[in-house]
């Protein structure tokens, strides 16, 4: 799959932040936070009795918003297996708003994704899908989920719900297997993968260390719970000058040779490495 290299899905997804759909007046603050992804929240952050109003407020606000293309504005709908999730989907499809992406929570099977893909296709919308992996059932079929639709641009790790589902404490070590499986599935599908937010707002150093662990594991970015976390996340997930220089060298050498593999600085470099280097350079170009 060459989606990272040739597709429109190559973009910076180093950080994301939620903003409540019930309060459109808060959207500008989230958009100005510096996060690469701004997610309008209709699910867990909205009380049941406010769901309808939040949906209506969000659609009305989206019809008026003018956005910088560098910001990926998405909407997290309610679980697609619930009444409010179905109402969310129907409202957005019938509104004609071509969202950059819809975030799908609590996905459990590829069939859910395929159904939503069909709905968006029938409505002639280009909307991508961000899929949250937060249940053990999803882990069991995660490779099929990740490949179930070309609309999927990213997987998100829902660590809080996953820990509850697995009956374990929400710690890095306890959830390492789940994180690793999600990273592998995303890599196999050629899509981005983002880690769960760090929940201790006052422990910036702890967040930084967990973000570094996530980056080293293969995550593209990490969520936030407050704008003050964004700067650090963007720094961690932005390729360093050394990484950029190395990536440029590999891409240039492949372009010159036209071969499928090369030896550069004594190391064998194959096409999968080239794709990752191209991804890094594309991200740097996007955030300049």
Put a short name on every predicted segment.
Residues 1-288:
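Expand to "…catalyze enediolate/carbanion chemistry for C-C bond making/breaking, isomerization
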